[in-house]
A protein has these predicted regions:
Chain A
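Cytosolic-side transmembrane-helix boundaries in multi-pass membrane proteins
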Residues: 1-29, 194, 200-208, 278-320
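Membrane-interfacial amphipathic/re-entrant helices at transmembrane-helix boundaries
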Residues: 1-52, 81, 88-89, 93-95, ...
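Alpha-helical transmembrane segments of multi-pass integral membrane proteins
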Residues: 27, 31-35, 108, 156-192, ...
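Single transmembrane alpha-helix segments in multi-pass membrane proteins
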Residues: 37-87, 112-122, 191, 196-200, ...
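Generic structural signal for small/hydrophobic residues in well-ordered secondary structure
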Residues: 44, 68, 81, 107, ...
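Transmembrane alpha-helical segments in multi-pass inner-membrane proteins
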Residues: 72, 211-300
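Alpha-helical transmembrane segments within multi-pass membrane transporters and channels
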Residues: 79, 89-131, 266-269
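Extracellular/periplasmic helix-loop junction at the C-terminal end of a transmembrane helix
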Residues: 126-159, 165, 186, 283, ...
Length: 320, 250, 297
């Protein structure tokens, strides 16, 4: 292999890589039309929402390195915002937008004190805030309290509409993530993650940057919550505000490949599909599985599935 | 020709207490534009503390710091960048998971004259790498660089923020003799291109050979200030720091 | 409010502070020596509670004694966990993300083990002592709370003694204050860290056992206390027992007196409100003040 053939091979790889998201999008957009299976549609719908929250979390946790255990707050706020607005007669799509805004505002309330803490302290603070919000929402009257809240939608239930809404949301999230990654915003986040003080020494304002990415991530997660609420037509604090929701949101990008663009997508798909299977067959061990997975990933392959795959690929290439 | 512009750095009676101990006491000095201004002092003299206060890492207990007439006392580092003051680190702090070019690119994006476009920022970053003499390392991971190159990366990164004043924290620490003289040449080039340099150093020979003006600290107070020749022959300085007869530049 | 009522509340707060303190020292020791934020602390507290429950129900051992008996068992478990898992983490002078996620994963595993072994119904340790009351003048105190408080003080006292009068304790304090210097003077980091980790887990179990006498629990037990431990650590500083005591006292006072204004369900929100307030008034909390001091280098 001479130099020019390596360059050409590299260009070919690059073209594959930029075509991949579009190919995937097309495949997913067409599949419900080609394969008629309501179960598959439902599975993919849920997976798209997971992918969205996974990508969103990764913006803050992967790019900026701020690990939050409290994303259920935004998911739940989004869910309840959409639910309340729809019951007041608002069209779902503006309601989703309102969910994004509410979630982003809440992220400010959380972030302004919490980002004064660094690293793990921030993480624990998010656990507490998330729990505090759940407690408050469980006790609140007009949202139905602990017994939950029902959405009444006076339109026929069209599964495909939900499907494409969720797919669009996931696509938007992916686009945002890909654009941010190599632009000024993304570099600033990476700098903060790698050395916050050195980043400040070259002009990055860590506090406002963290607040900004937090708001973006929260907004995306809030819309996901809203889309879920509309689909499910019934939500309750133990579910959408539950700690396990925060855990799942965090697990996906870590499993898939934290800090990358495709990692959260991979993690979202793996999680969505595996969760369906596990919850069906072995409901009592799913914490065990996720906990062990997390431990194994941290100790042996911090780059997650994507990291492991890259290593294998490189070794394979090296052998030629 | 007398420089009538406001000084690029004006430190006025700056003091820093840690508990009951004054690490820096009533230090005042000025740095004029277009100089290389150095300060030295024995261990514990308060050099690092003073540097940290100017670089925004510490707040003075009292006193004021000004740049071009504006009060910059206690400003955070990212604000100082916008005021045209950038620093290097004594123990290098590259962004280890980025390549050399990306390290500098960050600085270009967030410097005094920030550039938003990634392509344009990369261009400007290459320029900075060229000025620092490490453009050939642009695609290398920052973590594998030698100490000498990492120090140059610190400088390239700081320069990429378009500073009027560059604060160098013991930039020659850990360098070989020839690397040191190359580094000093680089500092002279930086000064000649219009950026003022303020330089804290342990290495007396380096400081005296490159600086236009030197300030000597001892026990947190200013002991002397003047040209290298003046400092080397000042008896108080000799007694406190240099010990015996000062080694001449030759 | 009468003086008697006020004093009652203060006494209540004091008793609570003792519990909170012993609950937090486990986390503090591990953090101080290894800069690891031990999220699995909650899981080990939960195990301690269940272990004490088992000893009480199967062997009719007094629950307080059972709590103390959990210490050696949990100490060994802690040592094992350190040997198998924690040791593999890279050493650091600052808390790292991988260590956080590792301990979190461990917590999930422990929770699940709890569910598998004991199911998800609430359990509690119920003895005649639970309902009885001690009268100090006009104030009546729940006996079990008083006993637990005394036990907590004993623990803290023992820990202080170990830290200040044993060779091991000195190594631990050396590592806490300056890891590199400690290594240079010959402290065996791995061995000391292993023992310190075991100690931290041991105290977690012990605290869990004591708490089990006061509150009902299920395998998710510990999350609320974990958060409180964190609030205490941020309030009082991370690296000294006296700091923990101060933080515990402040939190206990705030929580106890807040019952006058706010329904009991909102307790956790109060603790967090306190933390938020501290962070706004003292930006960065105490943890980042320490980080700022380190930044000088």
């Amino acid at each position: 292999m001479n130099a020019s053939s390596v360059v050409i091979a590299g260009q070919r790889v690059a073209r594959w890589r930029s075509a991949l998201p579009w190919a995937l999008l097309a495949a997913l957009a067409l599949s419900p039309l080609l394969i008629s299976s309501p179960n598959l549609v439902r599975l993919l719908f849920t997976t798209f929402l997971w992918v969205t929250t996974s990508i969103a979390w990764n913006l803050l946790g992967g790019f900026a390195g701020q690990v939050s255990f409290g994303f259920a707050v935004f998911y739940g706020m989004g869910a309840y915002t959409t639910a309340l607005l729809m019951n007041a007669g608002v069209n779902p799509y503006p309601a989703f937008l309102a969910s994004a805004v509410t979630a982003a505002l809440v992220s400010l309330v959380v972030g302004l004190p919490a980002f004064r803490l660094r690293g793990p302290y921030f993480a624990i603070a998010t656990i507490g805030i998330s729990e505090a919000v759940r407690v408050v929402m469980t006790n609140l009257g007009f949202t139905g309290g602990a017994s939950g809240y029902r959405i009444v939608e006076h339109r026929p239930f069209r599964q495909l509409e939900h499907y494409y809404t969720a797919l669009l949301l996931a696509a938007i999230a992916f686009a945002i993530s890909a654009l941010v990654a190599h632009a000024k915003f993304g570099l600033g986040l990476q700098a903060i993650r790698q050395d916050e003080d050195a980043a400040a020494d070259v002009g990055v304002n860590p506090y406002t940057y963290k607040l900004a990415v937090h708001g973006l991530a929260a907004g995306l997660t809030g819309v996901a919550g809203g889309v879920f609420a509309r689909y499910a037509a019934f939500i309750h604090p133990g579910g959408v505000f539950g700690f396990h929701t925060s855990v799942h949101i965090l697990l996906m990008p870590v499993i898939g490949g934290i800090g990358t663009v495709w990692g959260p997508v991979l993690g979202g798909f793996v999680f969505g599909i595996v969760e369906e299977e596990i919850v069906a067959s072995f409901p009592q061990v799913h914490l065990l599985i996720y906990g062990s997975l997390l431990i194994l990933i941290i100790l042996f392959e911090p780059g997650g599935i994507l990291g492991g795959a890259r290593k294998l690929f490189r070794r394979f290439r090296g052998k030629r | 020709m007398e420089n009538v512009n406001p000084p690029i750095l004006e430190v006025e009676k700056v003091t820093k207490y840690f508990g009951g101990l004054a690490a820096v006491k009533d230090v005042s000095f000025e740095v004029r534009q277009g100089q290389i201004f150095g300060f030295i002092g024995p261990n514990g003299a308060g050099k690092t503390t003073l540097f940290s206060m100017i670089a925004g890492a510490l707040k003075p207990s009292s006193g004021r710091i000004r740049s071009l007439g504006r009060d910059i006392t206690g400003l955070k580092p990212f604000k100082l960048i916008k005021s045209g003051i950038a620093r290097t680190h004594q123990i290098v702090r590259p962004f280890r998971e980025m390549r050399v070019l990306e390290n500098v690119q960050v600085a270009v994006h967030f410097g005094k004259n920030p550039i938003t476009s990634a392509t344009a920022a990369k261009e400007r970053a290459m320029q900075a790498l060229r000025s620092a003499g490490i453009d050939q390392l642009a695609n290398d991971p920052a973590s594998i660089l030698s100490v000498g190159h990492q120090k140059r990366l610190e400088i390239a990164r700081a320069l990429a923020t378009d500073p009027d004043l560059l604060l160098c924290d013991e930039i020659c620490g850990g360098l070989t003799h020839s690397e040191t003289s190359d580094m000093l040449q680089l500092l002279r080039r930086i000064r000649d291109s219009g950026t003022t340099v303020m330089y804290v150093e342990h290495d007396v020979k380096a400081i005296t050979s490159v600086c236009d003006r030197i300030m000597v600290l001892n026990y947190g107070r200013k002991l002397a200030e003047g040209t290298p020749e003046h400092i080397q022959s000042d008896p108080a300085v000799i007694e406190a720091y240099l010990g015996t007869r000062a080694p001449g530049k030759s | 409010m009468t003086l008697v009522d006020f004093t009652s509340l203060v006494v209540s707060a004091l008793l609570l502070a003792g519990i909170y303190a012993v609950m937090s020292v486990g986390m503090t020791v591990i953090y101080g020596v290894m800069k690891i934020v031990n999220l699995a602390h909650a899981g080990f507290m939960m195990l301690g509670a269940y272990f004490a429950l088992e000893l009480f129900e199967r062997f009719h051992i007094d629950p307080i004694l059972a709590a103390f008996l959990t210490f050696p068992v949990m100490f060994l478990i802690g040592g094992a966990v350190h040997w198998v898992l924690v040791r593999k983490l890279p050493h650091s002078d600052e808390p790292t993300l991988p260590s956080l996620l590792l301990m979190f994963g461990l917590w999930l595993v422990l929770q699940n083990l709890g569910y598998l072994i004991w199911g998800n119904t609430d359990r509690s340790i119920f003895t005649p002592r639970t309902l009885s009351v001690v009268n100090l003048g006009p104030i009546s105190i729940s006996t079990v709370r008083l006993v637990v408080f005394v036990a907590a003080l004993v623990c803290l006292g023992l820990l202080q003694a170990v830290l200040h009068y044993t060779w091991f304790g000195r190594s631990v304090r050396a590592l806490i204050q300056n890891r590199r210097a400690a290594l240079i003077v010959g402290v065996y980091e791995d061995r000391t860290a292993g023992i310190a980790f075991g100690l931290g887990i041991g105290f977690a179990g012990l605290a869990g056992g004591l708490l089990g006498s006061l509150y009902s629990f299920d395998p998710d037990f510990g999350r609320a206390f974990l958060i409180r431990a964190f609030v205490i650590i941020v309030l009082g500083g991370l690296e000294s027992i006296s700091g923990v005591a101060i933080g515990a006292l402040v939190l206990a006072l705030v929580e106890t007196f807040s019952i006058l204004f706010v329904p009991a369900g909102y307790q956790l929100a109060i603790s967090f409100g306190l933390l938020a307030l501290v962070l706004i008034v003292l930006p960065g909390g105490i943890a980042s003040l320490l980080a700022k001091a380190r930044r000088l280098a």
